[in-house]
Design a protein with these regions (language model features):
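N-terminal cap/leader regions of alpha/beta-hydrolase-fold enzymes
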Residues: 1-233
């Protein structure tokens, strides 16, 4: 279910000091060309997987310095669910996400923010669990320039949190986990100033190793994210 983190891609592993002093691993990608800013990339429930590393590298290729922290390191360092083990690993991933809690997550995301902010603006994005954490950060992590939240299943449970930076959300119309009626519509009603984009796709449409991957939706959501991050102050 888990694997060692092998440096097989364009980035490298670094250590990040959380705001409460805890040290965690993170995948770091330098920008290609002139630096446009920093991006915090928050994982799904499956850990700091190859998919999340590749998403960080995607932002690096677009000119951003990207850091993807390993959000479960406090409880189970190195936890990664491989694509073939998604069904078996999902329950453990959910348990780790729940056990980590919002305060630990904010401290860890804050530590990454502190690493990136010296060189300019910092934006955040995340997927599934990371989409919810990106919403949390947009509301409670001071100084962020923008947030792009992908299919965050628990955003609808955090409607009292108001993003303090420009924020957009992405959801799939065919997402069996996040219904348009009863979840997404509640987000739209509570936060009419937050653009909510609906795609003809399922949950995890940006994950290339998922059966729900939808290339057109993935591409459009990424373009919208880059546009937001590019104009953010």
């Amino acid at each position: 279910m888990t694997s060692n983190r092998e440096a097989v891609m364009a980035g490298n592993m670094i250590r990040v000091t959380s705001r409460d002093g805890f040290e965690l691993d993170a995948w770091h990608v330098k920008p290609a060309g002139p630096r446009k800013g920093g991006v915090i990339v928050i994982q799904e429930i499956f850990g700091l997987s190859d998919h999340i590393r590749k998403m960080a590298e995607r932002f690096g290729a677009a000119g951003f310095e990207a850091i993807a922290p390993s959000m479960y390191d406090r409880a189970e360092p190195g936890f990664i669910v491989q694509p073939r083990d998604v069904a078996a690993g999902m329950a453990r991933g959910v348990a780790l996400a729940t056990g980590n809690g919002p305060d630990n997550a904010l401290n860890d995301m804050g530590g990454v923010f502190d690493m990136l902010k010296a060189a300019g603006k910092v934006c955040i994005t995340g997927y599934c669990y990371g989409g919810t954490m990106s919403w949390l950060a947009a509301a409670r992590l001071d100084g962020l320039s923008a947030a792009s939240c992908y299919y965050g299943g628990n955003i609808a449970q955090m409607l009292g949190l108001r993003p303090q930076c420009p924020t957009i959300c992405h959801f799939g119309a065919k997402d069996a986990h996040i219904p348009l009626v009863g979840a997404v519509d509640r987000i739209e009603a509570a936060h009419p100033d937050v653009p909510v984009y609906i795609y003809d796709a399922g949950h995890g449409f940006a994950r290339k190793d998922s059966t729900d991957h939808d290339a057109a939706s993935d591409r459009l959501a990424f373009e919208r994210t880059l546009e937001l991050f590019g104009r953010a102050g």
